[in-house]
Amino acid sequence: MAGLRARRGPGRRLLVLSTLGFCLMLQVSAKRPPKTPPCPPSCSCTRDTAFCVDSKSVPKNLPSEVISLTLVNAAFSEIQDGAFSHLPLLQFLLLNSNKFTLIGDNAFIGLSHLQYLFIENNDIWALSKFTFRGLKSLTHLSLANNNLQTLPRDIFRPLDILSDLDLRGNALNCDCKVKWLVEWLAHTNTTVAPIYCASPPRFQEHKVQDLPLREFDCITTDFVLYQTLSFPAVSAEPFLYSSDLYLALAQPGASACTILKWDYVERQLRDYDRIPAPSAVHCKPMVVDGQLYVVVAQLFGGSYIYHWDPNTTRFTKLQDIDPQRVRKPNDLEAFRIDGDWFFAVADSSKAGATSLYRWHQNGFYSHQALHAWHRDTDLEFVDGEGKPRLIVSSSSQAPVIYQWSRSQKQFVAQGEVTQVPDAQAVKHFRAGRDSYLCLSRYIGDSKILRWEGTRFSEVQALPSRGSLALQPFLVGGHRYLALGSDFSFTQIYQWDEGRQKFVRFQELAVQAPRAFCYMPAGDAQLLLAPSFKGQTLVYRHVVVDLSA
Protein backbone atom coordinates (compact mmCIF):
# COMPACT_ATOMS: atom_id res chain seq x y z
CA MET A 1 0.00 0.00 0.00
CA ALA A 2 2.85 2.32 0.90
CA GLY A 3 4.54 1.41 -2.40
CA LEU A 4 1.39 2.17 -4.28
CA ARG A 5 1.10 5.59 -2.64
CA ALA A 6 4.79 6.17 -3.43
CA ARG A 7 4.19 5.47 -7.15
CA ARG A 8 1.18 7.84 -7.35
CA GLY A 9 2.89 10.76 -5.54
CA PRO A 10 4.75 12.48 -8.41
CA GLY A 11 1.79 12.23 -10.78
CA ARG A 12 -0.56 13.78 -8.31
CA ARG A 13 1.89 16.64 -7.68
CA LEU A 14 2.24 17.29 -11.41
CA LEU A 15 -1.50 17.48 -11.74
CA VAL A 16 -1.74 19.91 -8.86
CA LEU A 17 1.06 22.10 -10.26
CA SER A 18 -0.50 22.14 -13.66
CA THR A 19 -3.81 23.18 -12.22
CA LEU A 20 -2.17 25.88 -10.17
CA GLY A 21 -0.20 27.15 -13.16
CA PHE A 22 -3.32 27.39 -15.22
CA CYS A 23 -5.06 29.37 -12.51
CA LEU A 24 -2.09 31.71 -12.26
CA MET A 25 -2.14 32.22 -16.01
CA LEU A 26 -5.78 33.18 -15.85
CA GLN A 27 -5.02 35.70 -13.13
CA VAL A 28 -2.07 37.16 -15.02
CA SER A 29 -4.00 37.36 -18.26
CA ALA A 30 -6.76 39.22 -16.49
CA LYS A 31 -4.23 41.91 -15.55
CA ARG A 32 -2.35 42.00 -19.01
CA PRO A 33 -2.87 45.04 -21.33
CA PRO A 34 -4.87 44.54 -24.57
CA LYS A 35 -3.29 42.30 -27.22
CA THR A 36 -1.24 44.02 -29.98
CA PRO A 37 -3.33 44.17 -33.20
CA PRO A 38 -2.25 41.94 -36.11
CA CYS A 39 0.30 43.49 -38.47
CA PRO A 40 2.16 42.03 -41.49
CA PRO A 41 5.96 41.88 -41.28
CA SER A 42 6.37 44.66 -43.87
CA CYS A 43 4.17 47.08 -41.91
CA SER A 44 4.19 49.12 -38.74
CA CYS A 45 0.74 49.27 -37.22
CA THR A 46 -1.26 50.88 -34.51
CA ARG A 47 -4.90 50.19 -33.88
CA ASP A 48 -6.00 52.61 -36.60
CA THR A 49 -2.91 53.21 -38.80
CA ALA A 50 -0.58 51.12 -40.93
CA PHE A 51 2.66 52.10 -42.67
CA CYS A 52 3.96 49.45 -45.07
CA VAL A 53 7.25 49.27 -47.00
CA ASP A 54 8.31 46.69 -49.62
CA SER A 55 5.00 44.84 -49.41
CA LYS A 56 4.51 42.11 -52.02
CA SER A 57 0.76 42.70 -52.16
CA VAL A 58 -1.90 44.82 -50.51
CA PRO A 59 -1.65 43.69 -46.84
CA LYS A 60 -4.64 41.67 -45.74
CA ASN A 61 -3.78 40.96 -42.10
CA LEU A 62 -4.45 44.48 -40.84
CA PRO A 63 -6.65 45.73 -38.02
CA SER A 64 -10.18 46.19 -39.31
CA GLU A 65 -10.27 49.57 -37.54
CA VAL A 66 -7.48 51.01 -39.70
CA ILE A 67 -8.42 54.42 -41.05
CA SER A 68 -5.01 55.35 -42.48
CA LEU A 69 -2.84 53.20 -44.77
CA THR A 70 0.45 54.10 -46.43
CA LEU A 71 2.12 51.87 -49.04
CA VAL A 72 5.66 52.83 -50.07
CA ASN A 73 8.08 51.07 -52.41
CA ALA A 74 5.68 48.18 -52.93
CA ALA A 75 7.02 45.10 -54.71
CA PHE A 76 3.98 44.63 -56.97
CA SER A 77 2.75 46.57 -60.00
CA GLU A 78 -1.01 46.02 -60.16
CA ILE A 79 -3.76 47.09 -57.79
CA GLN A 80 -6.54 44.62 -58.45
CA ASP A 81 -10.30 45.00 -58.12
CA GLY A 82 -11.46 45.18 -54.51
CA ALA A 83 -7.88 45.40 -53.24
CA PHE A 84 -8.92 47.44 -50.17
CA SER A 85 -12.43 46.13 -49.57
CA HIS A 86 -11.29 44.54 -46.28
CA LEU A 87 -10.66 48.04 -44.88
CA PRO A 88 -14.12 49.63 -45.07
CA LEU A 89 -13.28 52.36 -42.52
CA LEU A 90 -10.28 53.69 -44.43
CA GLN A 91 -10.21 57.50 -44.64
CA PHE A 92 -6.62 58.15 -45.74
CA LEU A 93 -4.75 56.14 -48.41
CA LEU A 94 -1.28 57.06 -49.60
CA LEU A 95 0.25 55.02 -52.46
CA ASN A 96 3.47 56.92 -53.10
CA SER A 97 6.80 56.01 -54.72
CA ASN A 98 5.75 52.59 -55.92
CA LYS A 99 5.97 50.82 -59.28
CA PHE A 100 2.25 50.65 -59.95
CA THR A 101 1.41 50.48 -63.65
CA LEU A 102 -2.18 49.25 -63.54
CA ILE A 103 -5.15 50.02 -61.31
CA GLY A 104 -8.26 47.86 -61.66
CA ASP A 105 -11.69 49.30 -62.46
CA ASN A 106 -13.01 48.65 -58.95
CA ALA A 107 -9.76 48.85 -57.02
CA PHE A 108 -11.25 51.21 -54.43
CA ILE A 109 -14.72 49.73 -54.22
CA GLY A 110 -16.07 49.55 -50.70
CA LEU A 111 -14.14 52.60 -49.46
CA SER A 112 -17.16 54.80 -48.98
CA HIS A 113 -15.45 56.70 -46.12
CA LEU A 114 -12.19 57.47 -47.95
CA GLN A 115 -11.47 61.21 -47.98
CA TYR A 116 -7.81 61.45 -48.99
CA LEU A 117 -6.24 59.46 -51.84
CA PHE A 118 -2.67 60.08 -52.96
CA ILE A 119 -1.30 58.06 -55.90
CA GLU A 120 2.00 59.80 -56.61
CA ASN A 121 5.38 58.96 -58.16
CA ASN A 122 4.32 55.75 -59.86
CA ASP A 123 4.50 54.41 -63.44
CA ILE A 124 0.80 54.67 -64.25
CA TRP A 125 0.26 55.80 -67.85
CA ALA A 126 -3.50 55.20 -68.17
CA LEU A 127 -6.59 54.90 -65.98
CA SER A 128 -10.07 53.55 -66.54
CA LYS A 129 -13.11 55.81 -66.29
CA PHE A 130 -14.27 53.51 -63.48
CA THR A 131 -11.08 53.73 -61.42
CA PHE A 132 -12.64 55.92 -58.72
CA ARG A 133 -16.06 54.33 -58.64
CA GLY A 134 -17.58 54.21 -55.15
CA LEU A 135 -15.46 57.00 -53.60
CA LYS A 136 -18.42 59.20 -52.72
CA SER A 137 -16.64 60.81 -49.72
CA LEU A 138 -13.36 61.67 -51.46
CA THR A 139 -12.34 65.31 -51.09
CA HIS A 140 -8.62 65.25 -51.93
CA LEU A 141 -7.07 63.36 -54.85
CA SER A 142 -3.49 63.51 -56.09
CA LEU A 143 -2.26 61.79 -59.25
CA ALA A 144 0.92 63.83 -59.39
CA ASN A 145 4.15 62.65 -61.00
CA ASN A 146 2.93 59.60 -62.83
CA ASN A 147 3.20 58.89 -66.56
CA LEU A 148 -0.37 59.82 -67.40
CA GLN A 149 -0.70 60.97 -71.00
CA THR A 150 -4.47 61.21 -71.03
CA LEU A 151 -7.51 60.81 -68.79
CA PRO A 152 -10.75 59.11 -69.79
CA ARG A 153 -13.87 61.23 -70.05
CA ASP A 154 -15.90 61.45 -66.82
CA ILE A 155 -13.25 59.77 -64.68
CA PHE A 156 -14.02 62.27 -61.90
CA ARG A 157 -17.82 62.02 -62.18
CA PRO A 158 -18.20 59.65 -59.15
CA LEU A 159 -16.36 62.17 -56.95
CA ASP A 160 -19.29 64.35 -55.98
CA ILE A 161 -17.55 66.39 -53.28
CA LEU A 162 -13.99 66.50 -54.62
CA SER A 163 -12.44 69.78 -53.49
CA ASP A 164 -8.74 69.42 -54.39
CA LEU A 165 -7.10 67.70 -57.37
CA ASP A 166 -3.40 67.51 -58.26
CA LEU A 167 -2.39 66.35 -61.75
CA ARG A 168 1.03 67.98 -61.91
CA GLY A 169 4.06 66.12 -63.23
CA ASN A 170 2.29 64.09 -65.92
CA ALA A 171 3.16 64.10 -69.63
CA LEU A 172 -0.31 65.02 -70.86
CA ASN A 173 -0.90 64.71 -74.59
CA CYS A 174 -3.31 67.56 -75.27
CA ASP A 175 -5.20 66.00 -78.16
CA CYS A 176 -8.90 65.30 -78.53
CA LYS A 177 -8.82 62.85 -75.62
CA VAL A 178 -8.11 65.78 -73.31
CA LYS A 179 -10.72 68.15 -74.72
CA TRP A 180 -13.26 67.04 -72.11
CA LEU A 181 -10.76 67.89 -69.35
CA VAL A 182 -10.42 71.44 -70.67
CA GLU A 183 -14.21 71.78 -70.58
CA TRP A 184 -14.42 70.26 -67.09
CA LEU A 185 -11.71 72.53 -65.70
CA ALA A 186 -13.64 75.56 -66.94
CA HIS A 187 -16.77 74.62 -65.00
CA THR A 188 -15.69 72.60 -61.95
CA ASN A 189 -15.62 73.95 -58.39
CA THR A 190 -12.67 71.68 -57.59
CA THR A 191 -9.36 73.43 -56.93
CA VAL A 192 -6.86 72.13 -59.49
CA ALA A 193 -3.18 73.02 -59.49
CA PRO A 194 -1.86 74.31 -62.85
CA ILE A 195 -1.07 71.50 -65.31
CA TYR A 196 0.80 71.70 -68.61
CA CYS A 197 0.81 69.91 -71.95
CA ALA A 198 3.79 67.79 -72.97
CA SER A 199 2.53 67.34 -76.55
CA PRO A 200 1.66 67.93 -79.36
CA PRO A 201 4.35 70.50 -80.22
CA ARG A 202 1.86 73.32 -80.83
CA PHE A 203 0.55 72.97 -77.26
CA GLN A 204 3.81 72.04 -75.52
CA GLU A 205 4.24 73.88 -72.19
CA HIS A 206 0.79 75.43 -72.57
CA LYS A 207 -1.40 75.43 -69.48
CA VAL A 208 -4.27 72.99 -69.96
CA GLN A 209 -6.67 75.36 -68.22
CA ASP A 210 -5.94 78.03 -70.86
CA LEU A 211 -6.38 75.94 -74.04
CA PRO A 212 -9.11 77.34 -76.34
CA LEU A 213 -11.72 74.73 -77.21
CA ARG A 214 -11.84 75.93 -80.81
CA GLU A 215 -8.32 74.57 -81.28
CA PHE A 216 -9.58 71.00 -80.91
CA ASP A 217 -10.72 69.50 -84.22
CA CYS A 218 -12.18 66.28 -82.87
CA ILE A 219 -14.99 65.34 -85.24
CA THR A 220 -14.07 62.81 -87.92
CA THR A 221 -15.94 60.23 -89.97
CA ASP A 222 -15.60 56.58 -90.87
CA PHE A 223 -17.07 54.00 -93.24
CA VAL A 224 -17.97 50.82 -91.36
CA LEU A 225 -19.21 47.59 -92.90
CA TYR A 226 -22.98 47.55 -92.42
CA GLN A 227 -24.40 44.74 -94.56
CA THR A 228 -22.99 42.03 -96.79
CA LEU A 229 -24.94 40.93 -99.86
CA SER A 230 -23.68 37.45 -100.66
CA PHE A 231 -23.46 37.83 -104.42
CA PRO A 232 -21.42 39.67 -107.07
CA ALA A 233 -22.93 42.58 -109.00
CA VAL A 234 -21.75 45.07 -111.60
CA SER A 235 -24.10 48.02 -111.06
CA ALA A 236 -26.29 49.45 -108.30
CA GLU A 237 -29.09 52.00 -108.70
CA PRO A 238 -31.22 53.21 -105.76
CA PHE A 239 -34.68 54.61 -106.45
CA LEU A 240 -37.85 55.77 -104.71
CA TYR A 241 -41.21 54.38 -105.74
CA SER A 242 -44.51 54.79 -103.89
CA SER A 243 -42.66 56.28 -100.90
CA ASP A 244 -40.45 53.21 -100.54
CA LEU A 245 -36.72 52.89 -101.14
CA TYR A 246 -35.41 50.22 -103.51
CA LEU A 247 -32.14 49.14 -105.05
CA ALA A 248 -31.67 47.63 -108.52
CA LEU A 249 -28.57 45.44 -108.97
CA ALA A 250 -27.26 43.93 -112.20
CA GLN A 251 -26.14 40.34 -111.51
CA PRO A 252 -24.85 38.61 -114.64
CA GLY A 253 -23.74 35.64 -112.56
CA ALA A 254 -27.31 35.12 -111.35
CA SER A 255 -28.80 35.98 -114.77
CA ALA A 256 -30.99 38.64 -113.22
CA CYS A 257 -31.68 42.20 -112.32
CA THR A 258 -32.30 41.90 -108.60
CA ILE A 259 -34.59 44.39 -106.86
CA LEU A 260 -34.02 44.87 -103.13
CA LYS A 261 -36.27 46.86 -100.79
CA TRP A 262 -35.15 48.84 -97.77
CA ASP A 263 -36.74 47.59 -94.55
CA TYR A 264 -37.15 50.68 -92.36
CA VAL A 265 -37.87 48.53 -89.29
CA GLU A 266 -34.98 46.08 -89.56
CA ARG A 267 -32.86 48.73 -91.31
CA GLN A 268 -31.63 46.25 -93.88
CA LEU A 269 -31.94 45.60 -97.61
CA ARG A 270 -34.32 42.69 -98.32
CA ASP A 271 -35.03 40.64 -101.45
CA TYR A 272 -38.04 41.96 -103.34
CA ASP A 273 -38.13 40.80 -106.97
CA ARG A 274 -36.06 39.64 -109.94
CA ILE A 275 -36.09 40.38 -113.65
CA PRO A 276 -34.59 37.67 -115.91
CA ALA A 277 -31.40 39.01 -117.49
CA PRO A 278 -28.79 36.37 -118.47
CA SER A 279 -26.03 38.89 -119.27
CA ALA A 280 -27.09 42.07 -117.47
CA VAL A 281 -24.54 44.86 -117.20
CA HIS A 282 -26.87 47.61 -116.02
CA CYS A 283 -30.39 47.80 -114.60
CA LYS A 284 -31.66 51.39 -114.71
CA PRO A 285 -34.89 52.19 -112.84
CA MET A 286 -36.94 55.18 -114.01
CA VAL A 287 -40.15 56.53 -112.48
CA VAL A 288 -42.08 58.34 -115.24
CA ASP A 289 -45.48 59.85 -114.46
CA GLY A 290 -45.75 57.65 -111.37
CA GLN A 291 -44.99 54.45 -113.32
CA LEU A 292 -41.90 52.35 -112.68
CA TYR A 293 -39.76 51.16 -115.59
CA VAL A 294 -36.47 49.29 -115.55
CA VAL A 295 -34.14 49.44 -118.54
CA VAL A 296 -32.19 46.17 -118.66
CA ALA A 297 -28.98 46.43 -120.67
CA GLN A 298 -27.35 43.12 -121.65
CA LEU A 299 -24.17 42.14 -123.44
CA PHE A 300 -25.92 39.31 -125.26
CA GLY A 301 -29.51 38.42 -126.01
CA GLY A 302 -30.74 41.97 -126.49
CA SER A 303 -31.72 44.74 -124.09
CA TYR A 304 -35.25 45.38 -122.83
CA ILE A 305 -37.50 47.72 -120.90
CA TYR A 306 -39.72 46.28 -118.16
CA HIS A 307 -42.76 47.86 -116.53
CA TRP A 308 -43.96 47.27 -112.97
CA ASP A 309 -47.63 46.35 -112.88
CA PRO A 310 -49.02 47.27 -109.43
CA ASN A 311 -52.13 45.15 -110.07
CA THR A 312 -50.25 41.91 -110.64
CA THR A 313 -47.26 43.07 -108.56
CA ARG A 314 -44.78 41.85 -111.13
CA PHE A 315 -42.54 43.14 -113.88
CA THR A 316 -43.68 42.64 -117.46
CA LYS A 317 -41.67 43.25 -120.62
CA LEU A 318 -42.74 46.51 -122.25
CA GLN A 319 -40.44 46.75 -125.28
CA ASP A 320 -37.19 45.69 -126.90
CA ILE A 321 -34.25 47.98 -127.59
CA ASP A 322 -33.09 47.72 -131.20
CA PRO A 323 -30.13 45.26 -131.15
CA GLN A 324 -28.77 46.77 -134.37
CA ARG A 325 -28.49 50.14 -132.66
CA VAL A 326 -27.28 48.99 -129.22
CA ARG A 327 -24.91 46.05 -129.60
CA LYS A 328 -22.74 45.95 -126.48
CA PRO A 329 -24.04 48.33 -123.80
CA ASN A 330 -21.66 49.31 -121.03
CA ASP A 331 -23.47 52.09 -119.14
CA LEU A 332 -26.89 53.73 -118.82
CA GLU A 333 -27.73 57.27 -117.80
CA ALA A 334 -31.28 58.59 -117.25
CA PHE A 335 -32.17 62.27 -117.02
CA ARG A 336 -34.83 64.88 -117.67
CA ILE A 337 -34.57 67.92 -119.96
CA ASP A 338 -37.32 70.54 -120.22
CA GLY A 339 -39.89 68.10 -118.83
CA ASP A 340 -38.99 65.21 -121.15
CA TRP A 341 -37.49 61.94 -119.94
CA PHE A 342 -34.45 60.45 -121.69
CA PHE A 343 -32.00 57.64 -121.22
CA ALA A 344 -28.69 57.21 -123.01
CA VAL A 345 -26.81 53.95 -123.60
CA ALA A 346 -23.02 53.86 -123.97
CA ASP A 347 -22.11 51.21 -126.54
CA SER A 348 -18.66 49.64 -126.19
CA SER A 349 -18.70 47.56 -129.38
CA LYS A 350 -16.58 48.49 -132.37
CA ALA A 351 -19.64 48.73 -134.61
CA GLY A 352 -22.08 50.20 -132.09
CA ALA A 353 -23.23 53.73 -131.43
CA THR A 354 -24.01 55.45 -128.16
CA SER A 355 -27.71 56.23 -128.42
CA LEU A 356 -30.31 58.50 -126.85
CA TYR A 357 -33.91 57.41 -126.19
CA ARG A 358 -36.86 59.63 -125.34
CA TRP A 359 -40.11 58.81 -123.55
CA HIS A 360 -43.23 59.48 -125.59
CA GLN A 361 -46.72 58.57 -124.34
CA ASN A 362 -46.33 54.82 -123.87
CA GLY A 363 -42.73 53.92 -124.55
CA PHE A 364 -39.14 54.95 -125.17
CA TYR A 365 -38.18 55.71 -128.74
CA SER A 366 -34.85 56.27 -130.45
CA HIS A 367 -34.07 59.97 -130.47
CA GLN A 368 -30.43 60.40 -131.47
CA ALA A 369 -27.26 58.48 -132.29
CA LEU A 370 -24.42 60.27 -130.55
CA HIS A 371 -21.15 58.53 -130.97
CA ALA A 372 -20.36 55.70 -133.37
CA TRP A 373 -17.35 53.41 -133.60
CA HIS A 374 -15.57 54.64 -130.52
CA ARG A 375 -16.11 51.85 -127.96
CA ASP A 376 -17.69 54.11 -125.36
CA THR A 377 -17.47 53.05 -121.73
CA ASP A 378 -19.34 55.57 -119.57
CA LEU A 379 -21.80 58.48 -119.58
CA GLU A 380 -22.28 61.43 -117.25
CA PHE A 381 -25.15 63.91 -117.43
CA VAL A 382 -24.34 67.41 -116.15
CA ASP A 383 -27.04 70.06 -115.76
CA GLY A 384 -25.29 73.26 -114.77
CA GLU A 385 -25.86 76.90 -115.60
CA GLY A 386 -29.05 75.94 -117.43
CA LYS A 387 -27.03 74.11 -120.08
CA PRO A 388 -27.59 70.33 -120.04
CA ARG A 389 -24.49 68.43 -121.12
CA LEU A 390 -23.64 64.79 -121.69
CA ILE A 391 -20.03 63.63 -121.34
CA VAL A 392 -19.09 60.39 -123.10
CA SER A 393 -15.89 58.57 -122.13
CA SER A 394 -14.20 56.09 -124.41
CA SER A 395 -11.39 53.57 -124.36
CA SER A 396 -10.20 54.72 -127.78
CA GLN A 397 -10.24 58.52 -127.57
CA ALA A 398 -10.55 61.48 -125.23
CA PRO A 399 -13.93 62.07 -123.53
CA VAL A 400 -16.37 64.08 -125.66
CA ILE A 401 -18.68 66.79 -124.29
CA TYR A 402 -22.12 67.23 -125.85
CA GLN A 403 -24.36 70.21 -125.09
CA TRP A 404 -28.13 70.19 -125.47
CA SER A 405 -29.47 72.42 -128.22
CA ARG A 406 -32.96 73.57 -127.37
CA SER A 407 -33.59 74.68 -130.93
CA GLN A 408 -32.62 71.32 -132.41
CA LYS A 409 -33.73 69.31 -129.35
CA GLN A 410 -30.56 67.27 -129.68
CA PHE A 411 -27.10 67.04 -128.20
CA VAL A 412 -24.42 68.83 -130.19
CA ALA A 413 -20.71 68.06 -129.88
CA GLN A 414 -19.00 70.86 -127.97
CA GLY A 415 -15.44 69.63 -127.51
CA GLU A 416 -13.11 67.07 -125.99
CA VAL A 417 -11.37 66.67 -122.66
CA THR A 418 -7.94 66.52 -124.20
CA GLN A 419 -6.02 66.09 -120.93
CA VAL A 420 -7.06 62.42 -120.77
CA PRO A 421 -6.52 60.30 -123.90
CA ASP A 422 -8.79 57.53 -122.66
CA ALA A 423 -11.04 57.07 -119.64
CA GLN A 424 -13.00 54.14 -118.26
CA ALA A 425 -15.41 56.25 -116.23
CA VAL A 426 -16.33 59.91 -115.96
CA LYS A 427 -18.11 61.63 -113.05
CA HIS A 428 -18.56 65.23 -111.97
CA PHE A 429 -19.09 67.29 -108.83
CA ARG A 430 -19.29 70.90 -107.74
CA ALA A 431 -17.32 72.41 -104.86
CA GLY A 432 -18.26 75.99 -104.15
CA ARG A 433 -18.53 77.77 -107.48
CA ASP A 434 -16.19 75.38 -109.29
CA SER A 435 -17.09 72.38 -111.43
CA TYR A 436 -14.84 69.32 -111.56
CA LEU A 437 -14.52 66.15 -113.60
CA CYS A 438 -13.21 62.85 -112.21
CA LEU A 439 -11.87 60.43 -114.82
CA SER A 440 -10.69 56.92 -114.00
CA ARG A 441 -8.13 55.08 -116.11
CA TYR A 442 -7.25 51.40 -116.19
CA ILE A 443 -3.65 52.11 -117.20
CA GLY A 444 -2.21 55.31 -115.81
CA ASP A 445 -3.33 57.77 -113.18
CA SER A 446 -6.92 58.89 -112.72
CA LYS A 447 -7.40 62.62 -113.11
CA ILE A 448 -9.27 65.41 -111.34
CA LEU A 449 -9.96 68.35 -113.67
CA ARG A 450 -11.43 71.77 -112.95
CA TRP A 451 -13.44 73.83 -115.41
CA GLU A 452 -11.73 77.19 -115.96
CA GLY A 453 -14.44 78.87 -118.04
CA THR A 454 -13.18 77.87 -121.48
CA ARG A 455 -11.31 74.65 -120.79
CA PHE A 456 -10.48 72.03 -118.18
CA SER A 457 -7.22 72.09 -116.27
CA GLU A 458 -5.70 69.24 -114.29
CA VAL A 459 -5.58 69.78 -110.52
CA GLN A 460 -4.71 66.29 -109.30
CA ALA A 461 -3.56 62.85 -110.42
CA LEU A 462 -4.47 59.78 -108.35
CA PRO A 463 -2.63 56.43 -108.70
CA SER A 464 -5.24 53.98 -109.93
CA ARG A 465 -3.82 51.10 -111.93
CA GLY A 466 -6.63 48.71 -112.78
CA SER A 467 -9.43 51.18 -112.06
CA LEU A 468 -12.81 50.73 -113.73
CA ALA A 469 -14.94 52.67 -111.26
CA LEU A 470 -14.87 55.90 -109.32
CA GLN A 471 -17.57 58.00 -107.71
CA PRO A 472 -17.56 61.39 -105.98
CA PHE A 473 -20.34 61.80 -103.42
CA LEU A 474 -21.41 64.17 -100.68
CA VAL A 475 -22.53 63.12 -97.18
CA GLY A 476 -23.66 66.08 -95.12
CA GLY A 477 -20.78 68.51 -95.37
CA HIS A 478 -18.22 65.82 -96.20
CA ARG A 479 -17.18 65.26 -99.81
CA TYR A 480 -15.56 61.96 -100.79
CA LEU A 481 -14.24 60.11 -103.81
CA ALA A 482 -14.35 56.32 -104.02
CA LEU A 483 -11.71 54.93 -106.38
CA GLY A 484 -11.71 51.21 -107.11
CA SER A 485 -9.13 48.87 -108.61
CA ASP A 486 -8.89 45.30 -109.85
CA PHE A 487 -5.44 44.95 -108.30
CA SER A 488 -5.73 46.60 -104.89
CA PHE A 489 -8.28 47.68 -102.30
CA THR A 490 -10.65 50.57 -102.83
CA GLN A 491 -9.38 53.96 -101.72
CA ILE A 492 -11.68 56.56 -100.19
CA TYR A 493 -10.45 60.12 -100.57
CA GLN A 494 -11.80 63.16 -98.74
CA TRP A 495 -11.92 66.64 -100.22
CA ASP A 496 -9.60 69.13 -98.52
CA GLU A 497 -11.31 72.49 -98.89
CA GLY A 498 -8.17 74.45 -98.08
CA ARG A 499 -5.95 72.68 -100.59
CA GLN A 500 -8.75 72.13 -103.11
CA LYS A 501 -7.66 68.52 -103.52
CA PHE A 502 -8.58 65.03 -102.43
CA VAL A 503 -6.52 63.47 -99.63
CA ARG A 504 -6.40 59.78 -98.83
CA PHE A 505 -8.90 58.99 -96.10
CA GLN A 506 -9.65 55.27 -95.78
CA GLU A 507 -9.12 51.90 -97.44
CA LEU A 508 -12.02 49.50 -98.04
CA ALA A 509 -11.58 45.79 -98.70
CA VAL A 510 -13.66 45.61 -101.89
CA GLN A 511 -12.58 43.21 -104.62
CA ALA A 512 -12.85 44.37 -108.24
CA PRO A 513 -15.61 46.97 -107.78
CA ARG A 514 -17.59 47.89 -110.87
CA ALA A 515 -19.49 50.83 -109.38
CA PHE A 516 -20.01 52.83 -106.23
CA CYS A 517 -23.38 54.11 -105.14
CA TYR A 518 -24.32 56.50 -102.34
CA MET A 519 -27.75 55.75 -100.88
CA PRO A 520 -29.35 57.72 -98.02
CA ALA A 521 -31.75 55.45 -96.13
CA GLY A 522 -33.48 57.37 -93.36
CA ASP A 523 -30.79 58.32 -90.89
CA ALA A 524 -28.39 55.76 -92.38
CA GLN A 525 -25.97 57.09 -95.00
CA LEU A 526 -24.87 54.09 -97.07
CA LEU A 527 -22.17 53.46 -99.65
CA LEU A 528 -22.72 50.41 -101.84
CA ALA A 529 -19.83 48.70 -103.60
CA PRO A 530 -20.93 46.10 -106.19
CA SER A 531 -18.09 43.65 -106.79
CA PHE A 532 -17.42 41.62 -109.92
CA LYS A 533 -15.45 38.93 -108.07
CA GLY A 534 -16.83 38.86 -104.55
CA GLN A 535 -19.66 39.91 -102.30
CA THR A 536 -21.44 43.21 -102.70
CA LEU A 537 -20.66 45.27 -99.62
CA VAL A 538 -22.71 47.98 -97.94
CA TYR A 539 -20.83 50.49 -95.79
CA ARG A 540 -22.36 53.00 -93.41
CA HIS A 541 -21.00 56.50 -92.98
CA VAL A 542 -20.65 57.36 -89.30
CA VAL A 543 -19.54 60.48 -87.47
CA VAL A 544 -16.94 59.86 -84.77
CA ASP A 545 -16.19 62.23 -81.90
CA LEU A 546 -12.56 61.60 -80.98
CA SER A 547 -13.01 63.46 -77.72
CA ALA A 548 -15.65 61.00 -76.49
From Swiss-Prot:
Residues 31-64 form the LRRNT domain. Glycans are attached at N189, N311. Disruption phenotype: LGI3-null mice are fertile, have a normal lifespan, and do not show obvious behavioral abnormalities. They show strongly reduced expression and mislocalization of Kv1 channel complexes that infringe on the paranodal domain. Kv1 channel complexes mislocalization is further exacerbated following nerve injury, as Kv1 complexes are confined to the paranodal domain in remyelinated axons. SUPFAM superfamilies: L domain-like, Soluble quinoprotein glucose dehydrogenase. Residues 1-30 form the signal peptide. It is found in: Secreted; Cytoplasmic vesicle, Secretory vesicle, Synaptic vesicle; Synapse, Synaptosome; Cell projection, Axon. It comes from the Eukaryota. Keywords: Cell projection, Cytoplasmic vesicle, Exocytosis, Glycoprotein, Leucine-rich repeat, Repeat, Secreted, Signal, Synapse, Synaptosome. GO terms for biological process: exocytosis; regulation of exocytosis. Brain. EAR repeats lie at residues 222-264, 268-310, 314-361, 363-406, 410-453, 455-497, 501-543. GO terms for cellular component: extracellular space; juxtaparanode region of axon; synaptic vesicle. LRR repeats lie at residues 89-110, 113-134, 137-158. Residues 170-220 form the LRRCT domain. Interacts with STX1A. May participate in the regulation of neuronal exocytosis. This is Leucine-rich repeat LGI family member 3. The lineage of its organism: Eukaryota, Metazoa, Chordata, Craniata, Vertebrata.
